[in-house]
Amino acid sequence: MEDKKEYMSYDEYLTKVKDGIVTDQGNCPVTPLLLMLQGKWKTQVLYEFCIYDRARFGQLKKDLPGITNTMLSNTLRELEEDGLIFREQFNEIPPRVEYGFTEMGRDLLPVFYSIMVWGFKHENDLHL
């Protein structure tokens, strides 16, 4: 389903930012996304879904050295609650659960790409 809603242009956005009226609430429109992505593991887990269309808990655990089972479970639950990923449980023995991007999560891929390009451009200036 294609989104037909018209959004402001970049130039309109910059003008509204300077006037302090980007959203009806008057706050930064990026804040909700940044709040959803807070935490050490969320962006790393989302990156895994860029690699795999769907992934199981064990695959994610294997690909994310250092993450505990509890932290991975909590991260997946929070990303699901925020609507960025889905959880599908199959009625099989042994039980099987797979995770993947929702449409809203998949819509973040161009955003992640832009952030990656910015990171490469400024990598020598970043103090990590």
What label would you give each PLM region?
Residues 39, 43, 77, 106, ...:
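Generic detection of well-ordered alpha-helical segments
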Residues 91-115:
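Basic, amphipathic "hinge/linker" alpha-helix immediately C-terminal to the N-terminal HTH DNA-binding motif
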Residues 58-90, 94:
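Canonical helix-turn-helix DNA-binding module
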Residues 1-29:
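Recognition helices and adjacent regulatory flanks at domain boundaries
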Residues 128:
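Short, charged recognition helix plus adjacent turn
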Residues 47, 82, 111-123:
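Alpha-helical linker/hinge and terminal dimerization helices associated
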